[in-house]
Curated annotation (Swiss-Prot):
One BP annotation, GO: translation
Protein family per UniProt: Belongs to the universal ribosomal protein uS12 family.
UniProt subunit comment: Part of the 30S ribosomal subunit. Contacts proteins S8 and S17. May interact with IF1 in the 30S initiation complex.
Protein name: Small ribosomal subunit protein uS12
GO molecular function: rRNA binding; structural constituent of ribosome; tRNA binding
Domain of life of the native organism: Bacteria
Disulfide feature: none
Pfam (any one): Ribosom_S12_S23
Gene Ontology terms: cellular component: small ribosomal subunit
Length: 123
């Protein structure tokens, strides 16, 4: 416990909040190139084949990013836009690929929540 004199001299230091999306370097999104596109299985109570891409960002960092929605057209060397947002049942996946931008196509035949999946309005 510091004395009042020590507090007058030094003061209290504020704790730094931990950055959850360090690879984006403070940007809302980052462009990157897919180095590997693969499927992986989720943590214990869930069961599926989740689509994930390994992406080298323009910041020079390589991250794992989740590909949301049903079906995708991504392969190695595809240009993608990456945003923050983890996938709770995939350990180590803290980023998501934005559908409908750069080389990523939107989800086909999507009727609801279209803006999240880059799907155009059906005529």
């Amino acid at each position: 416990m510091p004395t009042i004199q020590q507090l007058v001299r030094k003061g209290r230091k504020d704790k730094k909040a931990k950055v959850k999306t360090a690879a984006l370097k403070g940007s809302p999104q980052r462009r990157g190139v897919c180095t590997r596109v693969y499927t992986t299985t989720p943590k214990k109570p869930n069961s599926a084949l989740r689509k994930v891409a390994r992406v080298r960002l323009t910041s020079g960092i390589e991250v794992s990013a989740y590909i949301p929605g049903e079906g995708h057209n991504l392969q190695e060397h595809s240009m993608v836009l990456v945003r923050g947002g983890r996938v709770k049942d995939l350990p180590g996946v803290r980023y998501r690929i934005i559908r409908g931008s750069l080389d990523t196509q939107g989800v086909k035949d999507r009727k609801q929540a279209r803006s999240r999946y880059g799907a155009k309005k059906e005529k």
